[in-house]
Amino acid sequence: MFIGRVTGHLVTTQKEPAMADSKLVVVEACSGAGPAEPALKATGKVLVAVDSLGAGVGEFVLVTQGSSARLTERTRTMPVDAVVIGIVDTVRLQDRVLRRADGTLTG
């Protein structure tokens, strides 16, 4: 799993029938949830993920990939490689809050 930020939505006019009602989002992976890094930063790695939670552009999300992406009730029969499994409210590391739901950061 990794933390990423939704940077956009992907619209397709045709897709695999099993995915007909699926919302797709563009997610950029983040790094920096370590002792030396005071904030989450974009890595430049971008991927497309199925999102059944309704994440919006700018929100931080928890993403899983590979065979684990096909273990949710919704994606069990879909040909997917990445799925949003959570919308991040707060990231805490030891005594620091890296990200709060209101978008503010503290160190």
Task: Give the positions of each predicted feature.
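Structural detector for short beta-strands of small beta-barrel domains
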Residues: 1-13
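Short aromatic-glycine-enriched beta-strand elements
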Residues: 18-27
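Short, structured beta-strand/loop micro-motifs enriched in basic residues and often containing a Trp
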Residues: 39-47
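Mid-chain, well-packed structural core segment of small domains
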Residues: 47-83
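C-terminal structural segments of small proteins and small subunits
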Residues: 69-106
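Short, surface-exposed secondary-structure boundary micro-motifs
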Residues: 9, 30, 66-67
